[in-house]
Amino acid sequence: MAAAPGARLLRAACASVAFRGLDCRRLLVCGTRAGPAVPQWTPSPHTLAEAGPGRPLSVSARARSSSEDKVTVHFKNRDGETLTTKGKVGDSLLDVVIENNLDIDGFGACEGTLACSTCHLIFEDHIYEKLDAITDEENDMLDLAFGLTNRSRLGCQVCLTKAMDNMTVRVPEAVADVRQSVDMSKNS
């Protein structure tokens, strides 16, 4: 059975609310309606102030980025092949992989909801040093990632900036999805 239209957006919104330390039930308080529509939720000014600055939902980042500012990103996949593509400033690296249909097996299995570590990437030192601070939630997921390094981050939590133009990120040789067993094969 297919998910109702907007279900992915609702899951992402729930993850964003949880990411900011708020109670996810606030999104679902209005209950279900007849038909496939997802309930509307409008945050109060207090809720917005409580949320504070944080990484926007990937969907919001795309909507906000009205200009076509793009940066080039090089992904070194598990086979050692370099996949070069462009992404919009403000999009997450997970968005870039999905929107450009890059051949990275199993990447982003949870669709950016911080429920797995399949979008684990390893950054160059000079780029890693400039990334926003890592959250406790992301750190918890990274603890379960295969091939963790001191320059590891989740692609769903890193948004592109102009300073990242022409960066190279490496995909670890194996994937550890906390929802499943570890996949040690390069081409599963």
UniProtKB/Swiss-Prot annotation:
UniProt source species: Rattus norvegicus (Rat)
Disulfide bonds: none
Transit peptide location on this chain: 1-64
The keyword Iron belongs to this UniProt entry's keyword annotation: yes
Record's function text: Essential for the synthesis of various steroid hormones. Participates in the reduction of mitochondrial cytochrome P450 for steroidogenesis. Transfers electrons from adrenodoxin reductase to CYP11A1, a cytochrome P450 that catalyzes cholesterol side-chain cleavage. Does not form a ternary complex with adrenodoxin reductase and CYP11A1 but shuttles between the two enzymes to transfer electrons.
N6-acetyllysine PTM sites in chain numbering: K70
Encoding gene, per UniProt annotation: Fdx1
Subcellular location: Mitochondrion matrix
Family classification: Belongs to the adrenodoxin/putidaredoxin family.
Assembly with partners or alone: Interacts with CYP11A1.
Name of protein: Adrenodoxin, mitochondrial
Tissues expressing the protein: Found in all tissues, most abundant in adrenals, ovaries and testes.
Entry binding sites for [2Fe-2S] cluster: C110, C116, C119, C156
Any single GO CC term annotated in Swiss-Prot or TrEMBL for this entry: mitochondrion
GO molecular function ontology, one term from the record: iron ion binding
Keyword Transport: yes
N6-succinyllysine PTM sites in chain numbering: K70, K162
Keyword annotations of the record: 2Fe-2S, Acetylation, Cholesterol metabolism, Electron transport, Iron, Iron-sulfur, Lipid metabolism, Metal-binding, Mitochondrion, Phosphoprotein, Steroid metabolism, Steroidogenesis, Sterol metabolism, Transit peptide, Transport
Tree of life domain: Eukaryota
One Pfam family, short name: Fer2
Primary subcellular site in the record, as a coarse category: mitochondrion
Modified residues (Phosphoserine): S67, S181
Record note on cofactor: Binds 1 [2Fe-2S] cluster.
GO annotation terms (biological process): adrenal gland development; cellular response to cAMP; cellular response to epinephrine stimulus; cellular response to forskolin; cellular response to leptin stimulus; cholesterol metabolic process; electron transport chain; hormone biosynthetic process
Transmembrane segments: none
Stored InterPro entries: 2Fe-2S_ferredoxin-like_sf, 2Fe-2S_ferredoxin-type, Adrenodoxin-like, Adrenodoxin_Fe-S_BS, Beta-grasp_dom_sf
